[in-house]
Curated annotation (Swiss-Prot):
Entry similarity comment: Belongs to the UPF0324 family.
Pfam families named among the record's database cross-references: Cons_hypoth698
Membrane topology field: Multi-pass membrane protein
Lineage per the UniProt record: Bacteria, Bacillati, Bacillota, Bacilli, Lactobacillales
Keyword Lipid biosynthesis among record annotations: no
Keyword Protein biosynthesis on entry: no
Principal cellular location given in the protein's record: membrane
Keywords assigned by UniProt, alphabetized: Cell membrane, Membrane, Transmembrane, Transmembrane helix
Subcellular location(s) per record: Cell membrane
Coiled-coil annotated residue ranges, if any: none
Protein name: UPF0324 membrane protein LJ_1117
């Protein structure tokens, strides 16, 4: 690892992806563009770098691979500082329970529909987690738990899953803002709907802030309740995938993976959420750590954009987009009902 960090390839890759990541953070603060979110903007900027000469991209390739893997995990760990467990506890058990129902139901429904529509397993799982938990960060957090024999295909699936949650999240953000006056919800109830149904944290913030502080506060608490489920969901999916591989290997008389991959970075995610909650960090320090998380995640997303083959992706997109549209609609309806009944 030290040798690659010292290499020219890593330096070139770091400069390319850092520019994309920082630009994504600043562009995400602009009106309307904020609906997309910093991570997706970084991905799109990474895609734009595919116009660079082939020689430059080939020289950066080892560093790009390192950043897409290691920086992703570092970003997920630091993202834990965004979770304030005390605030989640204050919101009450009903908030966590509703989040659990929404997340689990959406993951199962999106996965089932994706398979029905002909999507491959890995793509169905990643899209389901992105729709159910927290968008691009969930896709990238769950992906390391999925064993794959074809790394290029896996990268294509990651980008396609991110594209799904970006498009669906943006569409449903606008839809929920438009229909809010027709729903008979208080501002706080609408925040619950936005935080419980929209895909990215950026989407929840954009919708919640449209109707004042009460709406925004509710949206953030509900959304972070879903983010809290990232670690357990990734563990469950890793275990489930491992069991499936063992079973398939027994049937095919091939060698199965010997052990479940240990998601140490998810342990770090939980640890940082505990540290951020119970240690007296100044707000400016916590904000800085969360910003650092998005810088590293943005670099990983840009690296993904630089290295992926999009001509293949566009041919396979329809199956998961249809599934995500249906499951996102069901999740929105579920959250409207829950907000009226319990909040």
């Amino acid at each position: 690892m030290i040798s690659i960090v010292k290499s020219k390839s890593f330096g070139l890759a770091a400069v390319m992806t850092l520019i994309c990541s920082v630009a994504g953070i600043f562009l995400a603060k602009l009106p309307y563009v904020n609906l997309i979110g910093a991570l997706v903007i970084a991905l799109l900027l990474g895609i734009s770098l595919q116009v660079l000469p082939v020689g430059v991209r080939e020289e950066a390739a080892p560093g790009i691979g390192f950043i897409s893997n290691k920086f992703l995990r570092l970003g997920i760990i630091l993202l834990g500082f965004r979770l304030n467990l005390t605030k989640l506890a204050d919101a009450g058990i009903k908030t966590i329970l509703v989040a659990m129902l929404g997340v689990s139901g959406t993951i199962v429904l999106t996965y089932w529909l994706s398979k029905k529509f002909g999507a491959e397993d890995e793509l169905a799982v990643l899209s389901a987690c992105g729709c159910g938990i927290c968008g691009a960060a969930a896709v990238m957090g769950v992906s390391p738990q999925i064993e794959s024999r074809d790394e290029e295909r896996k990268r294509e699936n990651e980008v396609l899953a991110v594209a799904v949650v970006c498009v669906m999240g943006t569409v449903f953000t606008l839809l929920e803002i438009v229909i809010k006056p027709m729903l008979g919800l208080t501002d706080s109830q609408f925040g619950i709907v936005a935080g419980g149904s929209l895909h990215e944290i950026a989407h929840a913030i954009a919708a919640g802030s449209a109707f004042g502080e009460a709406s925004l506060d509710s949206a953030l608490i509900m959304k972070l309740s879903r983010v809290l489920l990232l670690a357990p969901v990734a563990l469950i999916i890793g275990y489930w995938y491992q069991r499936r591989l063992v079973k398939e290997s027994a049937q095919d008389h091939t060698q199965a993976p010997k052990k479940l991959p240990i998601p140490w970075f998810l342990g770090g995610f939980i640890l940082t959420s505990i540290l951020g909650t119970f240690l007296p960090f100044p707000p400016v320090v916590l904000d800085g750590l969360v910003q650092a998380a998005y810088v590293f995640l943005g670099m990983a997303m840009a690296a993904l954009g630089i290295s992926v083959n999009f001509s293949v992706i566009f041919k396979r997109g329809g199956t998961v987009f249809g599934a995500a549209a249906i499951s996102s609609t069901c999740l929105m309806i579920f959250m409207i009902i829950m907000s009226k009944l319990f909040f």
